Regions:
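Conserved N-terminal phosphate-binding loop of PLP-dependent enzymes in the Aspartate aminotransferase
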Residues: 1-163
Length: 163
C-alpha cells in the first residue's frame, strides 16, 4: 500500500487503524507474491489449462443438453460458470432479470442429485468452479456423468427418481 507522505505518516504513527488481510504481515505478503509468481509462470500456463478444462466442460454440457432436448443456458466468467436449466440458449451472457424467465431450480437440483449418483459432486444451485487441480480426464468423467444425469432427467420428466 502506498500514498501521499502526509497520509502514510498518519498510518505509520498509529493514528489511523488500517485493517486488512496482510498489513504489517510480511510472511503473508511473501506468500501472496510467491503464489502470484507461480500462477504467472510460463505465460500464465496454469490459467490457460483451467480455461481449457472449463471450455471442454461447458461445451460438452451444451452438446449433451441438445442431445436430450433439455433447455440450458450457461453463463460464464474465467474459472466459474452457472448452469441455468429451463432457459434455452447454450453459452451466452444474460443482462436482465427478464432473461431468467423459465429458470427451473428443480431441474438444477435434480441434475445435481443424478450427478452425485454418478460420482460428481456439484455445488448447490448450479454454479461450477474450475481450478488448477482439474484435468481433461476430470472433464471427460464429468461429461460422462452429465450424459447419464441428463438422460435420467429426460426419461423421468425432469424429476429425480432414486436408484
Amino acid at each position: 500500500m502506498g500514498g501521499k507522505k502526509e497520509i502514510m505518516d498518519c498510518i505509520r504513527g498509529n493514528k489511523v487503524l488500517v485493517p486488512g488481510t496482510y498489513p504489517g504481515y510480511g510472511l503473508g505478503m511473501a506468500a501472496v507474491l510467491a503464489t502470484l509468481d507461480e500462477l504467472t509462470k510460463d505465460d500464465c500456463a496454469v490459467y490457460k489449462q483451467v480455461f481449457k478444462v472449463q471450455e471442454k466442460i461447458m461445451d460438452g454440457l451444451v452438446e449433451i443438453s441438445r442431445k436430450y432436448d433439455i433447455p440450458l443456458t450457461i453463463t460464464e466468467a474465467n474459472g466459474v460458470f452457472d448452469t441455468l436449466f429451463g432457459i434455452p440458449g447454450g453459452r451466452r451472457r444474460l443482462y436482465t432479470d427478464g432473461e431468467l424467465v423459465g429458470f427451473d431450480k428443480n431441474i438444477v437440483n435434480n441434475f445435481q442429485r443424478y450427478m452425485q449418483e454418478n460420482g460428481v459432486f456439484l455445488m448447490f444451485g448450479g454454479r461450477w468452479y474450475v481450478n488448477a487441480s482439474h484435468t481433461m480426464e476430470d472433464a471427460e468423467k464429468t461429461l460422462a456423468a452429465a450424459d447419464k444425469a441428463m438422460k435420467a432427467l429426460k426419461e423421468n420428466n425432469y424429476n429425480y427418481i432414486a436408484k
